[in-house]
Design a protein with these regions (language model features):
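C-terminal extensions of enzymes
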Residues: 88-139
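Shared catalytic-loop signature of beta/alpha-barrel
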Residues: 2, 7-104, 108
């Protein structure tokens, strides 16, 4: 059994670990609130002898590169990952998308996250430059 939406915070991970409710934790950097919180959730999973699966939130190459880097730092039982978000996008804001070979994402190895922002693409996608204003919707 893999915990996905039921494990967003380290508190959720502790609860699931105590209850032995899952054999695998789905890790998603955006879902957990960043790289460090993802590592905290992973540490709890590993301490509970659970495995982990690297998931995605259909982010750009920036998010996928960040996820790839944090997943590369984790040990323990690994149940693959899915970092296909950039492959679903028509355009992206990086000069070169993260490579995938033999169904495996290739960890970028340049400075920082190993990616380079395409400033022309960034300007193209910026709402303020396109003439529209950000809107807030109450839910």
């Amino acid at each position: 059994v893999m915990a996905d939406e039921s494990v967003c915070t380290p508190y959720d991970a502790m609860r699931l670990a105590r209850e032995q409710a899952s054999h695998v934790f789905s890790l998603k950097v955006a879902k957990h609130g960043g790289l460090l919180r993802t590592r905290k959730v992973a540490a709890i999973a590993l301490a509970a002898d659970s495995g982990w699966y690297g998931g995605t939130r259909l982010e750009t190459s920036i998010g996928s590169a960040a996820s790839a880097h944090v997943f590369a730092t984790l040990g323990g039982q690994h149940y693959n990952c899915e970092l296909f978000g950039p492959q679903l996008l028509v355009d992206d804001i990086v000069t070169v998308r993260m490579a995938v070979r033999d169904f495996e994402p290739q960890l970028p190895d340049g400075p920082g996250l190993g990616i380079e922002i395409d400033l022309q693409q960034l300007a193209r996608f910026a709402r303020a430059l396109a003439g529209s204003q950000p809107q807030h919707f109450d839910m």
